Amino acid sequence: MVEFLKREYPSGTRVRLIRMDDSQAPPLGTEGTVTGVDDMGSLLVVWDNGSHLNVIHGVDEVQKLNKDTK
């Protein structure tokens, strides 16, 4: 799973937060940039609001953005 996530979300991938199970989570809809994937399969994200909370695979949800995503 980790290798799949590394291929699907390479460093620099832009994402939008859909769901995060954390009381300190950025607001839903916040966008950020993936900086890597850790050994547990969590996406390491620098959120545009300055937060650095990871996205936990299977718990949290992000939308992968591309140039056509609004």
Positions of predicted regions on the chain:
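Basic/aromatic-rich interaction segments and small domains that mediate binding to polyanionic partners
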Residues: V2-K70
